[in-house]
Amino acid sequence: SKKLAMILPVGPMGMYKWAVFFIKEWNVSCDHVTTFNMDEWADSEGNTLPNTDPASFENSMNNAFFDRLGELTVPPEQRNFATKENLPTYPEKIAKLKSEGARLVLVFGIGRMCHIAFWEPQFAEEYSSEQEWKKECYRLGAKLHPLTIEQNAITSFKSRTTLVPCTANTIGPGLFLQADYII
């Protein structure tokens, strides 16, 4: 029942099937968990799709994970998605949880272009030092690398590159480097 903060990717979706299975099998309530989705498709201004749109990450997470947990699920008010309004609140919310004793777990993979979330390697060129880069907590309307777009076309858009958004909201190293544990 200790507080737990988790930064989650939207995929691979298969891992959520197993998480749901074990949470239900072991009858573990997630009422002590607060989640932060690491990214979301957005336009260059950071505006995201409605959460009811089948292409939105929030919709995907609700369908594949939260809704399937039933009464054991993470309470809706403890689910955070990378919208223009909510992503800037992540640093403060995570800091508060950690000050209350929560552990921060980061679940991630490294993309083909060596990105974590949609934090692309070419962003480093914009910072004068590594320390400055490490402080950046998020980016709204981040421009994605062409190989990231290609990777997402293959994995999520049936290889239709023109359907993949070129920008997204994403967490940055100022958040993912705070993790107490990584998976």
Model segments located where?
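Class I SAM-dependent methyltransferase SAM-binding "motif I" and its flanking Rossmann-like core
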Residues: 117-167
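Short glycine-rich or small-residue beta-strand-to-loop segments that form or flank ligand, phosphate
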Residues: 5-10, 36, 182-183
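Ligand-binding beta-strand-loop-alpha-helix segment within the catalytic cores
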Residues: 28-107, 162-163
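A glycine- and small-aliphatic-rich helix-loop capping segment at beta-alpha/alpha-beta transitions
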Residues: 20-30, 52, 121-131
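C-terminal functional extensions of proteins
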Residues: 162-183
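N-terminal glycine-/serine-/threonine-rich phosphate-binding loop
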Residues: 1-6, 24
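Glycine-rich phosphate-binding loop
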Residues: 99-126
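Glycine-rich beta-strand-to-loop/alpha-helix junction loops that act as flexible
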Residues: 8-13, 108-112
